Amino acid sequence: MNTTIRRETLPLLALDDYQLAATRYHAERPQAQLLIAGATGVPQGFYRRFAEHAASRGFNTMTLDYRGIGQSKPDSLRGFEMEYLDWAHLDLAAAVDQHRHAERPLFMIGHSFGGHAFGLLPNHDQVAGFYTFGTGAGWHGWMPKAEQVRVLAMWRVIGPLMTRYKGYLAWSKLGMGEDLPLGVYRQWKRWCRFPRYFFDDPQMPGLAERFTLGDR
């Protein structure tokens, strides 16, 4: 580990003024800015070593916890109201805005949901380049048979029972990551019904065109 990397914990206000937790990893000789957009249910600490490495390579790097996750979650997720898309429209968009006056270009890396999020950003034009990994559709039909059974059991049996009892998806009990707010669970479950994920959702018309044309 490069022990010269200075790490700074900083508050971040989402576009609706929700308080988020973020961390800045300062490069000794910064050449660019980097924003890491995390996966569903993955706290920012998971990306610490990568962020430190990026900073050692000249990127002033920011990580954040989306609302409802990590240090940005309320005392209880029961009754916590939000939508899955808030992570992109309100949280990541605010993180992008944090860099709008920076002298150096901003790049993003998106993991899983973080990869989907780039096409949902209202301020994508502020990003000079974007790399995504581990970003999939989530439809069970693309998966091997054994995985299909596990996924369908999650959506049709385990998830409904767990959310009815808890009021949120106790994801951590399954060793899958952090617990998820009910709104995230419901939208995620809905999108995974479609082969092309949210692009096929009739409640989100024109989304594919907005991704293609950059018209947010």
Predicted regions and their residues:
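Active-site nucleophile loop of the alpha/beta-hydrolase fold
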Residues: 113-116, 131-141
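Conserved alpha/beta-hydrolase
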Residues: 44-77
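Active-site glycine-rich loops that stabilize anionic/oxyanionic intermediates
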Residues: 31, 36-42
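N-terminal cap/lid segment of alpha/beta-hydrolase-fold proteins
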Residues: 1-26
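Serine-hydrolase catalytic core
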Residues: 176-216
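Alpha/beta-hydrolase active-site loop
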Residues: 81-100
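Hydrolases whose catalytic domains are alpha/beta-hydrolase-1, hotdog thioesterase
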Residues: 117-121
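Alpha/beta-hydrolase fold nucleophile elbow
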Residues: 100-112
